[in-house]
Design a protein with these regions (language model features):
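Conserved acidic carboxylate
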Residues: 4-5
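Two-component/phosphorelay signaling modules centered on CheY-like receiver
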Residues: 8-26
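Acidic, metal-coordinating helix/loop segments flanking the phosphotransfer/catalytic sites
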Residues: 28-44, 48
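Two-component signal transduction core modules
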Residues: 45, 99-100
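Conserved phosphotransfer microenvironments
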Residues: 46-73
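Alpha4 helix (beta4-alpha4-beta5 surface) of REC/receiver domains from two-component response regulators
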Residues: 57-58, 83-99, 111
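A short, hydrophobic beta-strand element within the central beta-sheet of small alpha/beta folds
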Residues: 70-85
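C-terminal output helix
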Residues: 104-113
Length: 120
């Protein structure tokens, strides 16, 4: 699983929550995540949208390209947002599957990760 965000602290917090589900995580800043997407094809990506949900906009086209190449909806994309809603109601890229509102806690994020993994 790839965790992307500008804040190193948020990346660590999110990675620790995800690791509770038994997943290995790689954490990257938005500017270095592009290179990581070329190296690996993660099944799930968690993006921290920042204050305006735009911190990771530069990755959206690459994510959509990965989906096109795989012929599926993988990688799944979770956006961590300051606003609650659906990707559609927040006018987000079609690359975003699920929005999780901040503050990020294990009680909010872990069930979403488990659902994507098909464990719920």
């Amino acid at each position: 699983m790839l965790v992307v965000g500008r804040s190193p602290i948020n990346r660590v917090v999110v990675a620790k929550i995800v690791e509770r589900s038994g997943l290995k995580t790689i954490s990257e800043a938005p500017d270095t995540a592009m290179a990581m997407l070329r190296i690996m094809a993660p099944g799930t990506i968690i993006l921290d949208g920042g204050s305006d949900n735009k911190d990771c906009d530069g990755l959206m086209q690459s994510i959509l390209s990965l989906r096109l190449a795989s012929g599926s909806n993988l990688p799944s994309v979770i956006l961590l947002s300051n606003r609650a809603g659906t990707p559609e109601s927040l006018s987000l890229s079609s690359a975003v599957d699920i929005v999780v509102a901040k503050p990020i806690t294990p009680e909010r994020l872990q069930p979403v990760v488990e659902k994507l993994l098909g464990r719920c």
